[in-house]
Amino acid sequence: MIRDKFRSLLLLSLLLCLMPGIMAANQSFEARFESIVDQLNQGSKEEFIEALDIDAILRRAFDGLDLDPAVRSRFANNVIRGKKNIVSSFVRRTPEGSYTKLLNVRVNGDKATALLRYDLGRIGYGYHQYELVRDDEGNIRIVDWLDYTAGRTYSDMLRQSVVTYDPTESSVRGLVKSYDGSDESYARLAELMQAVRDKDFNSYHRIEPSLDRRLKHSLFMHLLNCDVGKMSRDQNRYNDAYRALENNFGDNPALALMLMNYRLSKGDFDDLGQSLRQLQQAFGVRDAAVLLLMSRAALGARHTDDAAVLADEAISIEPQLESSYWAAINAHVLLQHYSFAVSTARSLEDQFDKSLERELFEKSGRYANFVKSPQYEQWQAEKE
């Protein structure tokens, strides 16, 4: 008994000694990325660029590919030279008041992931989950990231790009990580990638049906078909590609943002709401922007009570997100909860130091009953 107690006390002492180190590791990952995000919001990309481990990203991109050495070297040099432009592709000029937000950091020893949300203006929101490691000198480096707007990692996008740049029977081997095909199937895949490179969409759609069945049904091919649908600007092909992606991989939360516009275009608000809930669960954090999108999906599906609850929650989580206030106002107006609508409008004015003029509501038909309500009249009278 005494020995067991002694062992327990020893373990507890050891744990208490380790805790400061564990907490310091957690804080340093989080502190580093908080600093990067602060700099991005001030217009500086230098800290982000400094943290990028391009060599590690390229090793992942090239892993398993049989590339011509000259092609490999030229492609790598182009990526390295364009290092400063990488961040510019997702940190763009956005509306006044928009910002990048660090949503969470998950630490596992000397590795971690950091989830960032980018405001892309009219396009909506982009999410990147960064994979972080600590190098031999203790510096925190970015070695890859999952881009939720593309449904794949940055290294996988580079992998596809380098093979598209020089599509040969040798280079396409290893392109699809989960696929091991025959010589003939790789020859067809090389022809297909040549058509992508040359933007020869007629040849692409002639070759694609003849591919090996396992390859045709892979996530890689579904994503490639979506890419080609966008590149060709063929609306029918685009819809077919996204319909197939939804039917076969629609429950994959990493594809929720990719599928969002397609689901919106066909008015599939219930499925959109479900995929956004899956996305929220995958994030491991309640994100106000996703709640806002869920609120809009619920409103589209005529689940107005849910829309109001979700928009109100978005405001409580992140008061700086102005769009959430309008989503809440619209939902409460539809529910004829005019006191809640006025209360939300007042909160919006206070948070953003602005005055909502009468004309803003009175010129829109959606607020016709709201502007006739006693609650609205009292609010306007108090403003005069």
Language-model features: where?
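Surface-exposed, charged secondary-structure patches
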Residues: 26, 71-123, 246-251, 384
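Alpha-helical segment of the N-proximal tetratricopeptide repeat
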Residues: 180-210, 214, 221-231, 258, ...
